[in-house]
């Protein structure tokens, strides 16, 4: 039975962290305190860096979404997804219902059906009628065709049109009727026909124009029927097949009265250049085109008739006018080129300014994250310094414990004559150690202050431009831009000012980028030195803790 158990001696109760901290403070030993009023200046950049970090998912390819099913998308991802809309599901349901209901109606259009682009359907010029003969023109659930027989249409030229005047009916021997000819030739009143024999009916079956009475077919504007041709065609439908010979004999008769009336020229009629001379052909004063017996001096001095020749002055004026026009066109081209170049310069400066601003923002984010990293390194240095102080106290306590735990017969008595000197040496040692600890703390604080000041100076944008400076700067820009301007207007001045200001901003941003780059390099070098010191202090502290642990295990 041991003495401790015999006398019922129990170890003292373990002190709480608060009691231990108060006891260490009474002894003059530094302890860790967490002030509530301390704020980190670059905490926002640390949160920004944490948001940018992507969590590693160890899952096979294609199964990443099942590795962490409870994870919710971040707030930034939700903000960046501009395609999400609360009405997407509603619109999808409505579109699905609309497409389902359209399939049961007759107006449904199958997107996979062939378009009705058959050359044999829906045209009067088709010999197969209006109905499309293609079996692929009908789509899924499309309404049925009324008549799918390609030879049963009402407009079939082989069943309804026989020797009609329509050129597309296939009869090249059909000639226009007198009524159609008169209606076509007398359409423009007061105009003298260029061919006096155009109104005569041709006796040659091959001389008639098979396309004169037919409706004009335009591939882009549809089919425009001719009224006269339709009348003749309708009459030809009613006439029997054997009546064509009588019609041809009647057409051979020449109507001299009508032809003479068409050939008469009204000499009292006023000359209208836009009708008689549509193409700007020069004529003499009498209005005759082919009369070579007229004198060029016949109407000289009467009004201002058109001359049949050009004088030297007219030729010179015309050449000057042409040169002036060419010069004006060249000037206009140069103006357009100048304007286009300035607009391109404005766009280039805008793009460059935007990229410079993005680079500056990225640099500021980088140096801000370096500031947050500096604050974290400062916390590590403070904790490491406190660990060194407490490890030194632990070393003293281990030595004292070893002295108290030795044999009871080993009596240790200090020299009473040196007591004052020992006390003085102990006080000096405590003072020196305390001064050294405070110096280490001040160095750590000074390093953090220098790093923070360096980063804040790099992130400061400087003073903004004042109104007076802007006003005088605008005047200076306009004065300097006059040598690059030609007939400048307000828009031109605005482009010049924008180009100059954008270039000025780009220069300022370039200077700040250089400052950010230099500061970032200095900060990285400083933090590398601090990390090296932390590594060395950590290794030294690890060795000391290991020695104290070994000494405690050797105490029996």
Curated annotation (Swiss-Prot):
<dbReference type="GO" id="GO:0031201">
    <property type="term" value="C:SNARE complex"/>
</dbReference>
<feature type="domain" description="t-SNARE coiled-coil homology 1">
    <location>
        <begin position="339"/>
        <end position="401"/>
    </location>
</feature>
<dbReference type="GO" id="GO:0019905">
    <property type="term" value="F:syntaxin binding"/>
</dbReference>
<feature type="compositionally biased region" description="Basic and acidic residues">
    <location>
        <begin position="249"/>
        <end position="261"/>
    </location>
</feature>
<feature type="region of interest" description="Disordered">
    <location>
        <begin position="1"/>
        <end position="20"/>
    </location>
</feature>
<protein>
    <recommendedName>
        <fullName>Protein transport protein SEC9</fullName>
    </recommendedName>
</protein>
<dbReference type="InterPro" id="IPR000727">
    <property type="entry name" value="T_SNARE_dom"/>
</dbReference>
<keyword id="KW-0653">Protein transport</keyword>
<dbReference type="GO" id="GO:0006906">
    <property type="term" value="P:vesicle fusion"/>
</dbReference>
<feature type="compositionally biased region" description="Polar residues">
    <location>
        <begin position="231"/>
        <end position="248"/>
    </location>
</feature>
<keyword id="KW-0677">Repeat</keyword>
<feature type="compositionally biased region" description="Polar residues">
    <location>
        <begin position="187"/>
        <end position="217"/>
    </location>
</feature>
<dbReference type="GO" id="GO:0005484">
    <property type="term" value="F:SNAP receptor activity"/>
</dbReference>
<feature type="region of interest" description="Disordered">
    <location>
        <begin position="64"/>
        <end position="307"/>
    </location>
</feature>
<feature type="compositionally biased region" description="Polar residues">
    <location>
        <begin position="74"/>
        <end position="104"/>
    </location>
</feature>
<dbReference type="GO" id="GO:0005886">
    <property type="term" value="C:plasma membrane"/>
</dbReference>
<comment type="similarity">
    <text>Belongs to the SNAP-25 family.</text>
</comment>
<feature type="domain" description="t-SNARE coiled-coil homology 2">
    <location>
        <begin position="493"/>
        <end position="555"/>
    </location>
</feature>
<dbReference type="GO" id="GO:0006887">
    <property type="term" value="P:exocytosis"/>
</dbReference>
<feature type="compositionally biased region" description="Low complexity">
    <location>
        <begin position="151"/>
        <end position="186"/>
    </location>
</feature>
<keyword id="KW-0813">Transport</keyword>
<feature type="compositionally biased region" description="Polar residues">
    <location>
        <begin position="113"/>
        <end position="135"/>
    </location>
</feature>
<keyword id="KW-0175">Coiled coil</keyword>
<dbReference type="GO" id="GO:0015031">
    <property type="term" value="P:protein transport"/>
</dbReference>
């Amino acid at each position: 039975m041991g003495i401790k158990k015999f006398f019922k001696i129990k170890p003292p109760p373990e002190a709480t962290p608060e009691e231990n901290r108060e006891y260490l403070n009474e002894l003059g030993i530094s302890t860790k305190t967490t002030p509530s009023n301390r704020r980190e200046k670059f905490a926002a950049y640390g949160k920004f860096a944490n948001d940018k970090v992507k969590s590693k998912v160890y899952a096979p390819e294609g199964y990443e979404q099942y590795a962490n099913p409870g994870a919710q998308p971040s707030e930034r991802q939700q903000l960046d997804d501009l395609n999400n809309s609360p009405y997407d599901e509603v619109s999808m349901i409505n579109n699905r219902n609309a497409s389902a209901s359209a399939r049961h109606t007759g107006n449904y259009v199958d997107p996979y059906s062939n378009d009705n682009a058959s050359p044999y359907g829906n045209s009067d010029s088709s010999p197969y009628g209006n109905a499309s003969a293609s079996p692929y023109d009908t789509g899924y659930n499309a309404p049925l065709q009324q008549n799918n027989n390609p030879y049963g249409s009402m407009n079939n030229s082989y069943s309804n049109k026989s020797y009609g005047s329509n050129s597309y009916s296939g009869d090249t021997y059909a000639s226009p009727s007198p009524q159609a000819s008169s209606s076509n030739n007398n359409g423009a009143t007061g105009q003298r026909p260029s061919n006096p024999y155009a109104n005569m009916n041709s006796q040659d079956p091959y001389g008639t124009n098979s396309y004169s009475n037919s409706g004009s077919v335009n591939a882009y504007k549809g089919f425009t029927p001719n009224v006269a041709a339709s009348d003749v065609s309708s009459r030809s439908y009613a006439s029997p097949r054997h009546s064509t010979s009588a019609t041809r004999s009647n057409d051979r008769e020449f109507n001299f009265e009508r032809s003479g009336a068409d050939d008469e020229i009204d000499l009292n009629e006023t000359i209208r250049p836009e009708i008689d001379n549509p193409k700007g052909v020069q004529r003499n004063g009498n209005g005759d085109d082919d009369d070579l017996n007229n004198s060029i001096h016949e109407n000289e001095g009467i009004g201002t008739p058109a001359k049949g020749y050009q004088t030297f002055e007219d030729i010179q004026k015309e050449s000057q006018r042409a040169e002036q026009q060419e010069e004006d066109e060249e000037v206009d081209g140069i103006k357009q080129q100048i304007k286009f170049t300035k607009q391109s310069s404005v766009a280039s400066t805008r793009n460059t300014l935007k990229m410079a601003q993005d680079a500056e923002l990225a640099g500021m984010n980088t140096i801000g994250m370096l500031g947050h990293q500096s604050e974290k390194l400062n916390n590590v240095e403070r904790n490491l310094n406190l660990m060194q102080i407490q490890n030194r106290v632990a070393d003293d306590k281990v030595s004292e414990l070893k002295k108290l735990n030795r044999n009871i017969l080993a009596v240790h008595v200090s020299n009473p004559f040196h007591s004052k000197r020992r006390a003085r040496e102990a006080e000096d040692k405590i003072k020196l150690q305390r001064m050294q600890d405070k110096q280490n703390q001040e160095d750590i604080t000074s390093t953090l202050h220098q790093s923070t000041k360096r980063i804040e100076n790099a992130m400061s944008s400087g003073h903004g431009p004042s109104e007076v400076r802007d006003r005088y700067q605008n005047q200076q820009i306009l004065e300097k831009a006059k040598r690059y301007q030609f007939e400048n207007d307000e828009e031109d001045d605005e482009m010049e000012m924008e180009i100059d200001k954008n270039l000025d901003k780009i220069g300022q941003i370039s200077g700040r980028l250089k400052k950010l780059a230099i500061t970032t390099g200095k900060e990285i070098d400083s933090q590398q030195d601090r990390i090296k010191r932390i590594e060395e202090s950590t290794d030294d502290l690890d060795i000391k803790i290991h020695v104290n642990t070994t000494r405690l295990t050797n105490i029996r």
